[in-house]
Amino acid sequence: MNIIKTLPFFILCLLMSPQAYSDNAVQLTEQRQLFQQAKKALQDNQISRYQMLHKQLDGYPLQGYLQYLYLNGRLSQASNASVSEFLKKEDGSFYAERLRMFWLNKLAQQNRWSDYLNFYQPPQSSARQCYYLQALLASGQKQKAFELTPELWLVPHSQEKACDPVFSAWEAAGLLNNDLRYQRMMLALRANQFSMATYLAKSTANPVDNQQLVKQWQAIHNNPISVFNGLAKNSSLSADTALNREMIIHGLQRLARRSPEQAFTSWSNIKTRYNFSQQDTIEARKAIGKWAALNRDKKALRYFGDIPGGEWQVRAALWQKDWK
């Protein structure tokens, strides 16, 4: 009974839809033309004409983008109120976040830290995060700023210049300790950022030992086979420590890229000298097997051994037709 009652309504909708679609298409075409005219008026700096055309685009999806172009091109004259109004109206759009980024940069350049705090919303770039901490410091919120500083400090690369004043204040407060310096040095080493690691090593509590560590890591990174061949004579690397095991696994992974066979031979000679963990073994054999598989080396499956299966083991088994 309900279907019979509603059927005329659906028939009416179907009969009307072609005309409605046609009207919408005409309106959309007109709006597109208005959009192009408004954009051209902006480019020609015809602001009165732009504003007149902009008002006629209510409901058009790209109306907000036009206003973004208008504000972004005039940030030096923009007010907090106009930017805030735009951000609220276009909240969630990509161009709202872009305008926020550019506006924050402008506020930071002018040291308008109170305004910066009002407009700041994460996530932001490292530079803008550090400007945020500068703003906190300028407003007397030292504790909050210093609580957020370690996250920006603990990166393997040189940090943005905007972070320098924050790091200086943090260090002056006695909060940049040796443990944090060492942690960052290790992050730099693991990211193969050797210049950065050397710089950081000099500021640790044991600069001589840590600079030697950086040199040792860089040596095994650049020429692993040479280090492995002279391992018996290398008193610092021959000790069975967690750090030495990590360096050796890194060297094996590097060597595997150049010669899986040499890497496997080195691994076979080295593995009994150290107390490698199961994960160490997996990482070493996975790297050797993967690079062998990439080279279509028939020994790839042997190099993988009995470690847990992975994508490259499956590929090697398929092209070798060995899926036992």
Which residue ranges define each predicted feature?
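Aromatic (phenylalanine/tyrosine) cluster motif
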Residues: 9-10, 21
